[in-house]
A protein has these predicted regions:
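N-terminal secretory signal peptides that target proteins for export/translocation
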Residues: 1-5
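Extracytoplasmic entry segments of secretory-pathway proteins
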Residues: 6-7, 23-25
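Bacterial N-terminal signal peptides
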Residues: 9-20
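Soluble non-transmembrane domains of integral membrane proteins
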Residues: 25-184
Length: 184
């Protein structure tokens, strides 16, 4: 009886293993790792508008475009064969459902709440360069020095980190060419 019980458990474990392995492989295939260690990601923020500045609560709301650029040789393609010089994944459906490769999930540490995602676009170039842009409205907390108010000057900061990756996997670099603001 004991032997039969042990064999039954062994069969159950083997069956679960056979079923779980393809699932695990499918999950790994859908969410691959960064292309290299470390993967360098150039990041910049275009500030389109400062919507609100709250000195009392030390926060500010902005409309921004977050831009990230990296190289993933696994995505390289022959432009002539494909009939296009770039592959574009635009909008939440194409980005979330059609594009299945790795991208750096960027988290703003001092963001209050969830913010509004208004647009997303990911472009893959023939050499494997990838450009990601998302337009969002965010509320950010930052310490303010108000001693000279109303003649003060403030540095409004956003702290961006790669979510879900260790520093050995993804390194963010500020790209001044991607860091801008409107003149208004």
């Amino acid at each position: 009886m004991k032997l039969r019980k042990h064999l039954l458990w062994l069969c159950l474990i083997v069956c679960i293993g056979l079923v779980a392995c393809p699932v695990a492989n499918a999950i790994d295939a859908a969410m691959p790792n960064p292309p290299a260690s470390p993967t360098e990601v150039s990041v910049g923020v275009f500030v389109a508008d400062i919507i609100d500045l709250d000195e009392v609560n030390e926060n500010f709301q902005i409309e921004m475009i977050l831009i990230a650029v990296w190289h993933d040789p696994r995505l390289a393609f022959d432009a002539e064969k494909e009939g296009t010089k770039e592959k574009i994944f635009q909008g939440p459906y194409q980005f979330a459902e059609v594009y299945t490769a790795w991208w750096p999930q960027l988290l703003i540490l001092n963001e209050v709440g969830r913010g509004d995602y208004n647009a997303v676009k990911l472009t893959v170039y023939p050499d494997g360069m990838v450009r990601y842009a998302e337009q969002r409205n965010v509320l950010l907390e930052t310490p303010m020095s108000l001693q000279d108010y109303p003649f003060d000057t403030q540095r409004l900061k956003a702290y961006i980190v790669p979510f879900g990756n260790r520093k050995e996997e993804v390194v963010l670099k500020i790209n001044d060419g991607l860091r801008q603001a409107t003149d208004e």
